[in-house]
């Protein structure tokens, strides 16, 4: 529960003066209206809610794909309520239904009996995991459900169920360097590059997995997904022949004592990857001027210090379509936030890739994930960032004022990422599968305590 006060109310009628609407008032307000105003209402001063259209809600809510779900949702600040107007009176006291990122929304689980460990305190877990736990205590097989069976084995003296890793449905093929000169330039140019053949020799690697994939290659759980593993000096990617872009890209960012800004990316340079057949490659001509989207790099080329090393990432196999507005967030996240996280954690490993969720049911419809970790006990942060043509979710002009808040608003469980991408992570990590599942189902919080 959370304290609420009649002095802390947002009157939505003040925002929708010309619109007929019905509001389900409270800490998780929903609005039903015949027409949704184009004004996003995020930039009024001292505003205590964040509005979302249903498709743009954070994926961790699993709340979007149903005809009964309203069009507009208000994520309200702690201890505030969103109501229609000043006639609302049921406001003093307490309430629940706020964002489950808030610690005040967490319940207390007490387990007592012969099956439970004694005097044991564990990290928070979600309610959807309790059903499997109850079935294990009764020694019965649970019906299909949204929980991750085995993720609460650490609560039990003698776990009834022993989980195993998911079976990989599509294994990677090889993408060798057959010719040092590309059969087609794919409409790409790179004016500053001198010797194409010498630079392409750098792509003739067998693997760099031990550094960039310390916990193993992500397994693909979707059938008939044709892809190959591309190794580079600075990163590894799983390139899909089905979608003509990487399923995932992995790299390690070391803790740098030098805190100066990263070098700029080599300008006006993108080149064909000689390892990928022309028929399965994106073309630079796919991105002419005048479109509302451009191309972005999954692995930032400027993470390499020299121009020679940057050419390893200035490849058509490293690009994804990207709205320019999203590129502002993407660049700041990599150039500033990842460097910050690397210093705080003494180095991080990153996996990122595209998500396709056209009907926003939080299940992958086709083949942003960023785990951060340190040595010893693994720590993970996962984010599923909505790829939108504008940044109206945030108001501040400077990226330093809004990007990290936006990223944190879209934090997710690793399990959410797996459901969306059809990938399975950490299969080569040397620890029991139940402990890996515990890691995958944990939802980090960034809450600031309120007195």
Put a short name on every predicted segment.
Residues 48-69, 141-173:
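Polar, surface-exposed loop/tail segments
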Residues 134-142:
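Short, hydrophobic alpha-helical segments
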Residues 1-11, 74:
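Metal-dependent active-site segment of extracytoplasmic phospho-/sulfohydrolases and closely related
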Residues 18-120, 125-133:
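Active-site neighborhoods of enzymes that stabilize oxyanions during catalysis
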Residues 39-55, 82-83, 141-147, 329-335, ...:
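Acidic/polar loop patches that form or flank catalytic/metal-binding clefts of enzymes
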Residues 24, 67, 102, 123-128, ...:
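Solvent-exposed, acidic/flexible segments
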Residues 83-87, 119-123, 145-147, 361-363, ...:
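Short conserved micro-motifs at the rims of enzyme active sites and ligand-binding pockets
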Residues 133, 151-152, 158, 163-451:
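Domain-level detector for secreted/extracellular nuclease and nuclease-toxin modules, and
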């Amino acid at each position: 529960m959370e304290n609420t006060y009649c002095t802390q109310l947002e009157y939505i009628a003040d925002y929708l003066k010309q619109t007929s609407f019905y509001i389900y008032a409270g800490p998780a307000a929903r609005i039903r209206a015949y027409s949704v105003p184009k004004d996003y209402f995020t930039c009024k001063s001292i505003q205590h809610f964040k509005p979302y259209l249903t498709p743009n809600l954070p994926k961790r809510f699993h709340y979007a794909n149903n005809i009964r779900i309203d069009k507009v949702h208000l994520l309200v600040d702690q201890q505030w309520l969103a109501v229609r107007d000043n006639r609302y009176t049921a406001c003093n006291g307490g309430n629940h239904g706020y964002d489950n990122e808030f610690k005040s929304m967490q319940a207390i689980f007490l387990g007592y009996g012969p099956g439970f460990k004694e005097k044991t305190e564990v990290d928070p877990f979600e309610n959807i995991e309790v059903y499997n736990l109850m079935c294990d205590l009764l020694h019965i097989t649970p019906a299909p459900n949204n929980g991750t069976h085995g993720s609460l084995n650490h609560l039990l003296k003698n776990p009834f169920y022993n989980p195993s890793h998911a079976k990989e449905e599509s294994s990677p093929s090889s993408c060798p360097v057959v010719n040092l000169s590309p059969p087609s330039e794919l409409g790409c140019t790179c004016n500053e590059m001198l010797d194409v053949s010498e630079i392409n020799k750098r792509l003739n690697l067998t693997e760099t997995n031990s550094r960039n994939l310390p916990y193993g290659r992500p397994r693909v759980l979707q059938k008939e997904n044709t892809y190959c593993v591309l190794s580079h000096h600075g990163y590894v990617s799983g390139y899909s022949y089905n979608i003509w872009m990487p399923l995932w890209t992995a790299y390690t960012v070391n803790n740098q004592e030098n805190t100066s800004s990263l070098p700029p990316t080599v300008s006006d340079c993108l080149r064909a990857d000689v390892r990928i057949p022309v028929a399965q490659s994106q073309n630079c001509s796919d991105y002419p001027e005048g479109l509302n989207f451009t191309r972005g790099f999954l692995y930032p080329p400027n993470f390499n210090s020299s121009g020679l090393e940057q050419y390893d990432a200035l490849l058509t196999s490293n690009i994804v379509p990207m709205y320019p507005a999203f590129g502002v967030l993407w660049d700041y996240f990599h150039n500033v936030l990842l460097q910050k996280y690397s210093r705080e954690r003494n180095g991080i490993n990153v996996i990122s890739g595209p998500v396709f969720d056209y009907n926003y049911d939080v299940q992958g419809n086709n083949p942003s994930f960023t785990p951060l970790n340190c040595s010893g006990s693994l720590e993970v942060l996962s984010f599923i960032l909505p790829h939108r043509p504008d940044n109206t979710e945030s108001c501040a002009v400077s990226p330093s004022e809004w990007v990290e808040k936006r990223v944190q608003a879209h934090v997710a469980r690793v399990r959410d990422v797996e459901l969306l991408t059809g990938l399975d992570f950490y299969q080569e990590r040397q620890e029991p599968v139940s402990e890996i599942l515990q890691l995958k189902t944990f939802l980090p919080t960034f809450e600031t305590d309120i007195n």
